[in-house]
């Protein structure tokens, strides 16, 4: 069971999510490899809608943290999030 994912960015439009993920992938291809992004729309009420770009598929918190640490060492901010079942 994949209980964790790594959030890379949170932006205002699906187009921006796609564009920014392409930039992140180009810079971090050796880390991200062929992992597919998952874009989640989140409505934050007064703050509006955001599109969060995540890399899913981590079975453990440790695996997600290790992946995020690699990204951070390469200059990419990220956040480990638990998948809501």
Locate the predicted segments by residue.
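Long, low-complexity, acidic/serine-threonine-proline-glutamine-glycine-rich intrinsically disordered tracts
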Residues: 1-4, 30
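A short beta-strand micro-motif
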Residues: 6-8, 53
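Extracytoplasmic
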Residues: 13-85
